[in-house]
């Protein structure tokens, strides 16, 4: 998994927390799995990442920035588990605190030595604050070939509930 969090650090590298309670809190550094601005070496092929926003208050709008062209996420899962079918062509993914997504990223079209950035464009506080933490992490493409198999059309078959089979119907009125 890629656990994305914003943190503030003291001069010695220890975590700095506010002395008083705050209704929301934003760090000045983005960490992925406990590291600031990390990189991951990737083969030319597909990777499945579980993304988790582990921040206290910050919302992220994540996108991938390759050396040229565009690179999109294919979403295969969310809070409810695996989706019925992959959702390709997702250019930006907005993810709130505690929220999870499972995505496929395909690095097959890139050359060894290419760098793909994962960036955040969401403001803090969301949605109208300044986008102050842009860099999240970097993927470095190696010369090795990875998984290039096509994604299945169905990730997880979902059996639909037939409303006609309900034994009892209830109406809820909220005031």
Question: What does each of the following model-derived ranges do?
Answer:
Residues 3-162, 166:
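Histidine- and aromatic-rich segments of cupredoxin/plastocyanin-like copper-binding domains
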């Amino acid at each position: 998994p890629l656990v994305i969090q914003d943190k503030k650090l003291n001069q010695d590298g220890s975590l700095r927390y506010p002395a008083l309670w705050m209704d929301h809190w934003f760090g000045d550094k983005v960490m992925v799995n406990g590291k600031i601005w990390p990189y991951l070496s990737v083969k030319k092929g597909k990777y499945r990442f579980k993304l988790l926003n582990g921040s206290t208050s910050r919302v992220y709008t994540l996108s991938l920035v390759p050396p040229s062209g565009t690179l999109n996420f294919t979403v295969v899962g969310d809070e409810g588990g695996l989706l019925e079918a992959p959702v390709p062509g997702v250019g930006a993914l907005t993810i709130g605190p505690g929220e999870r997504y499972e995505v496929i990223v395909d690095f097959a079209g890139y050359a060894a030595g290419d760098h793909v950035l994962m960036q955040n464009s969401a403001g803090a506080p969301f949605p109208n604050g300044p986008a102050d933490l842009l860099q999240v992490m970097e993927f470095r493409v190696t010369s090795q070939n990875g998984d290039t198999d096509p994604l299945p059309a169905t990730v997880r078959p979902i059996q639909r509930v037939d409303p006609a089979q309900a034994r009892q119907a209830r109406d809820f009125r909220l005031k």
